[in-house]
């Protein structure tokens, strides 16, 4: 099963417990990107409850890797059967409004030699739930952490 590690410069210096405590004390509600990231992190641990809550019953997406339309159950299988060890950065919001979210994140894939990729995901919402999404993946010939404000080693 694939592994997901989250890189977040916003939360650097805080333990997971401190982050949750801050949210509880401040009454902070997770925003769209936090909810999306948390949902898929939980899927990798076998917990599908949050994904089931945030996806619309009519959800459908075209998976560019397989060339088929998928529903949320298909997406769960695809994510949980990933054989590679993958570390994923915390998503950065490109654009967001009530009905749309566009994010970019980076991955380090642990092959014999590490390789890197970026992915941009565009998400449409209906009634506050994810109706569809499209993700495009770009293989990179450089380590994105060398050019951004974080590094993989802090989170591996």
Predicted regions and their residues:
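A solvent-exposed, acidic/Ser-Thr-rich amphipathic alpha-helical stretch
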Residues: 34, 48-99
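Short, low-complexity N-terminal intrinsically disordered segments enriched in polar/charged residues
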Residues: 11-53, 57, 150-156
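A beta-strand edge to alpha-helix "cap/lid" segment located at domain peripheries
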Residues: 38, 76-156
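Short histidine/acidic/glycine/proline-rich micro-motifs that form metal-
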Residues: 42, 65-66, 108-110
């Amino acid at each position: 099963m694939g592994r997901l590690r989250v890189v977040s410069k916003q939360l650097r210096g805080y333990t997971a417990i401190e982050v949750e405590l801050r949210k509880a004390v401040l009454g902070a509600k997770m925003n769209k990107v936090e909810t999306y990231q948390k949902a898929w992190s939980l899927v990798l641990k076998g917990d599908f409850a949050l994904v089931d809550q945030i996806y619309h019953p009519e959800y459908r997406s075209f998976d560019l890797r397989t060339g088929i339309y998928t529903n949320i159950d298909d997406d769960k299988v695809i994510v949980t059967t990933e054989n590679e060890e993958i570390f994923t950065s915390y998503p950065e919001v490109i654009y967001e409004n009530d009905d749309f979210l566009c994010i970019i994140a980076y991955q380090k894939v642990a092959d014999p030699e590490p390789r890197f990729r970026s992915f941009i995901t565009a998400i449409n919402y209906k009634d506050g739930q994810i109706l569809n999404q499209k993700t495009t993946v770009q293989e990179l010939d450089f380590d994105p952490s060398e050019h951004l404000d974080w590094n993989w080693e802090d989170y591996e």
